[in-house]
Amino acid sequence: MTCQAFASSDNFVPLNSDSSPSLPLIMHHSAGECLPVSNHATNVVSTVPSVLSLIQTPKCSHFHFAMMTSGNVSAGLHYSVPSCHYGNQASTYGVMAGIKPATPEMLSASLSQSRILQTCSMPHPNVVNGVSTLQSSLTPCLYKFPEHALSASSCALGHSFTPMHQTLLSDDPTASDFKQEFRRKSKSVEEPVDMDSPEIRELEKFANEFKLRRIKLGYTQTNVGEALAAVHGSEFSQTTICRFENLQLSFKNACKLKSILSKWLEEAEQVGALYNEKVGVNERKRKRRTTISISAKEALERHFGEQSKPSSQEIMRMAEGLNLEKEVVRVWFCNRRQREKRVKTSLHQNAFSSIIKEHHECR
């Protein structure tokens, strides 16, 4: 028996067979979707009793099998299957075999059998005989229903079909190799890092040393992030530096950041050393304390008694006579006036306190 695809739905093409009567075939799939004839035919027919329980479900499309013999109806089967649609088509996928032009006898027989099936939970004996006759007389051509429309829960005929994609994937060695490779890579990525490894110990040691050396150089975590932006183009946030010092980054990210921070730390220490040397050379030295001899002090005391506020020319003359610098003589007179002022203030305070004391004693 051969099957031929229809160009459009609801067209009938007779099956070419000499041993069987002229059987029309309704189909809405292409010829490429026709499965080879196998023992699935028995499965389809054997599922009829289980389909009978689905008769009362709404929106069902009906399959009508009938075996015609020289104008007499020997047996007929009428049962419902949930409608299956594909895309925007409203047509129903299915097969229809053994239908001839309807006659009043055929319609009455179909109507009576439909009523019997709707009121009884078990199939009628005539229906069972009709199924046996149909199974022995017909060689149906099976078609694969759309997988998105027919499932094990929505269509009883789906129990006898195996999804094509599962068979292909299970038999394809390339797919199995790909799955094994994917599992191997996933396992290698998810392997935990050994916390006692030398790499972890070295990373902890560097994080502690980096924190101490950063504080010694006077940099904050924010300063480090801004300084790295000038070198690498992207600024590192203060949170990133803090998480690195506290070992809160992942091992992979911490290793990447370690090389960057190590290079920056070396450059920062070199710049800091050069800065300290430059500041040490240019730093203003403290002037050494000048000592004045006793004879020079006596001479300056005599001049102070004569003039407590000498002019600039007089200070220069005294400095030349005593072999001292002019600035030394000027500073000595300033200090001497301040000391005299403190002495006079203390004398006035003592005198005032003594007067007050005498006044209280007189009372």
Curated annotation (Swiss-Prot):
A motif (9aaTAD) lies at residues 5-13. GO terms for molecular function: DNA-binding transcription factor activity, RNA polymerase II-specific; RNA polymerase II cis-regulatory region sequence-specific DNA binding. One of its GO terms (cellular component) is nucleus. Pituitary gland. InterPro entries: HD (IPR001356), Homeobox_CS (IPR017970), Homeodomain-like_sf (IPR009057), Lambda_DNA-bd_dom_sf (IPR010982), POU (IPR013847), POU_dom (IPR000327), POU_domain_TF (IPR050255). Keywords: Activator, DNA-binding, Homeobox, Nucleus, Transcription, Transcription regulation. Pfam families: Homeodomain (PF00046), Pou (PF00157). Its main location: nucleus. It comes from the Eukaryota. GO terms for biological process: positive regulation of transcription by RNA polymerase II; regulation of transcription by RNA polymerase II. The keyword Nucleus applies. Residues 285-344 bind DNA. It is found in: Nucleus. Residues 195-269 form the POU-specific domain. Transcription factor that activates growth hormone and prolactin genes. Specifically binds to the consensus sequence 5'-TAAAT-3'. PANTHER family: NETRIN-1-RELATED, POU DOMAIN. Belongs to the POU transcription factor family. Class-1 subfamily. The 9aaTAD motif is a transactivation domain present in a large number of yeast and animal transcription factors. This is Pituitary-specific positive transcription factor 1. It comes from Gallus gallus (Chicken). The gene is POU1F1.
